[in-house]
Amino acid sequence: MTFRYRGPSPKGDQPKAIAGLVEALRDGERFVTLLGATGTGKTVTMAKVIEALGRPALVLAPNKILAAQLAAEFRELFPENAVEYFISYYDYYQPEAYVPGKDLYIEKDASINPEIERLRHSTTRSLLTRRDVIVVASVSAIYGLGDPREYRARNLVVERGKPYPREVLLERLLELGYQRNDIDLSPGRFRAKGEVLEIFPAYETEPIRVELFGDEVERISQVHPVTGERLRELPGFVLFPATHYLSPEGLEEILKEIEKELWERVRYFEERGEVLYAQRLKERTLYDLEMLRVMGTCPGVENYARYFTGKAPGEPPYTLLDYFPEDFLVFLDESHVTVPQLQGMYRGDYARKKTLVDYGFRLPSALDNRPLRFEEFLERVSQVVFVSATPGPFELAHSGRVVEQIIRPTGLLDPLVRVKPTENQILDLMEGIRERAARGERTLVTVLTVRMAEELTSFLVEHGIRARYLHHELDAFERQALIRDLRLGHYDCLVGINLLREGLDIPEVSLVAILDADKEGFLRSERSLIQTIGRAARNARGEVWLYADRVSEAMQRAIEETNRRRALQEAYNLEHGITPETVRKEVRAVIRPEGYEEAPLEADLSGEDLRERIAELELAMWQAAEALDFERAARLRDEIRALEARLQGVRAPEPVPGGRKRKRR
């Protein structure tokens, strides 16, 4: 099936950018950059390129929130095609770790989200059965996954009228990782009552009922997951595994190989007098081997993935990329963030696992259960489109062509940029804030330190300006509530340090003030300045004031680039008779889980809004877990559960005090 785009017709710079990208990719350019200004509709451009080329596509986003937003947009643009969402399936994740200085072992603790797990299986099923597939993914796409050849080869084909003895069918379901549960039928499970089998594919939302007559399949139908009502008749179906890590045939041979590595490593420790490490490794690994023999799996089975997938030591693991056909296309959204993220994933994972191996918690082969190195990622992709308003050095150095998308479909211009002296800057700033407040507009102010932000906010409030500080410790709910209050006019000015994070594209903001603009560094680099300037690009009166005693090189380049874009936009509007208008964007209510900071419920949200809030909290929880701030991660997990309960219309679960209890062994 071909891709069928059902979105708005391209406008502004979109047609030119689409044609440029398609031409470059058809000419065989391996790396191409789409340099698209904020608000120019880069998603529509990506969609039209995918439609024109007709190739499966992977769109990588830097975090779960942006991935969810992109997936929703692509589903609207391609309602007849397979748009899949592939992120980590953990609601709560605490990686296995060891802190030698404290002799503290932290066992892996995780809570899997069954809906996200279903979406992951839906992704791999789609990739193996059709070509009209767009996968929107997070960095989870470069982490280990099962062997796609095994996943494809082990599927089960059931057809009406064909012989299939009941016991053979049950045995095959167990081989594919499906669990029997005659009470609770959910994705990845099946139940059997007499000659009726009900199977819930791991990637579907509705189970399949198979009715046997003796050894023959008499009837196949799809049924309602709750009522059991027959929805439609099926001539047959293909069932893919319920797990990406299948126990291969010849399991005993694999276990012998693991045991061989174990005794070599035990001997290594004993020769160095590290008896404790040897004993620890022996106990843990023998326990895992026994679990694998009896149950076919064990906690942390992914650490033995090298043996199960037949990979050689040091060889890259199978990942989602291996499920794509060879000619697939990759888009790296917000590439100035995504590229460094891809470059850094391997090193962080290796450092944590190396400690576990060195102290006898894991075999050296566990190091092969890892994300891809950046160079390995590039080896697996044939063509990449970098998408960003401010492409990084890697993108610009390697791209055979840079395609610009400067003109917005709305006709809005990049904001006016003015450099102002630091003398009396606060008084000048207050005058600007008051002027905009009188017109019903808002102001964003960015400073360099927490102390400066706190002192400036206090000073503004003391002088009658309704200002708030966007504190770095605010969680997702408080942050969204603060932005909502700004948009509703409860206050007129928001002071912050890093205004580059998502969620700050506020149409009511007509002034962005950057203090200490000439202090070069991460938040005052050319790329950061252009991104911050873009925060005023959704208002027709948008202005940016740079307070500085001198014009730094970064400032000069950012101003020149903004002025260049603005000149192009003005010329286009003049030629086409377009009058820019401020973006109209609905102000969404913010909801908090019950008992959260004793805050009252503000308003009921739609299911889509609730899911967006949950995605934001999941991102914060991951970040807390990666920073080893497990108390905060546990609190965020409880908040997520409360929101999910509200989404499902049930009573919120009780929070787990202090997180889950952890066992040692």
Curated annotation (Swiss-Prot):
Keyword Repressor attributed: no
Binding residues annotated for ATP, in chain numbering: 36-43
GO process annotations (BP): nucleotide-excision repair; SOS response
GO MF terms held by the record: ATP binding; ATP hydrolysis activity; DNA binding; excinuclease ABC activity
Residue ranges occupied by any UVR domain in the UniProt entry: 611-646
Domain notes: The beta-hairpin motif is involved in DNA binding.
Function: The UvrABC repair system catalyzes the recognition and processing of DNA lesions. A damage recognition complex composed of 2 UvrA and 2 UvrB subunits scans DNA for abnormalities. Upon binding of the UvrA(2)B(2) complex to a putative damaged site, the DNA wraps around one UvrB monomer. DNA wrap is dependent on ATP binding by UvrB and probably causes local melting of the DNA helix, facilitating insertion of UvrB beta-hairpin between the DNA strands. Then UvrB probes one DNA strand for the presence of a lesion.
Full protein name: UvrABC system protein B
Phylogenetic classification of the source organism: Bacteria, Thermotogati, Deinococcota, Deinococci, Thermales
Gene: uvrB
